Amino acid sequence: MMAVVLLAGCGASNIWQDVQNGDMASVQSQVKSGADLDARDALGRTPLYYAVYYEHLNIVALLVENGANVNMKHKANKTPLHLASELGNIQMVRLLLKAGAKVNALDSDQGTPLDWAVGTLHNDTAALLRKNGGKEGSALIP
C-alpha cells in the first residue's frame, strides 16, 4: 500500500521505486542526474523517509551525503529520525544524528524520537537518543 501511495504521489521520478527496492546503483544514477532528494509523496514523505522505512542504510547515507534534508517532516510531522527510532535501527539513528537531525523534533502528537524509541521498547536506541540530548515530548511542552 505504501508503494502505491508513493508512486501515485510522485509521478515523473522513479527514485521512489529505486529507494523502495534498495537499488543502490539506480539511486546513485538518480542522484547524479539531479533528482530532487526532498521531493514529497502525497503524504509528505521524502526519498530519505522511504530509505529509513525500508531500512536501506547505504541509501540513507547516500541521500544524506548528497544533501537530503534530514529534518523534513511528513504530514504527521514525523521526521526520518522519528521513524528510525521507532524501528530501533540504532545505526540509522547514529547516522541521522551525525547528519544534524533534530533529536527533540516534535511530531503532531507532541512525540519526540525518544518517545518513539521508548514506546517501541528499543532501549539501546533510547539510551543513544538520551546521550545526544533527547528528551520526551512531555518535558518539552510548557
Regions found by a protein language model. Give the residues of each.
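Bacterial N-terminal signal peptides
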Residues: 1-7
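Ankyrin repeat A-helix N-terminal signature
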Residues: 17-22, 50-56, 83-89, 116-122
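Ankyrin repeat structural motif
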Residues: 23-31, 56-64, 89-97, 122-131
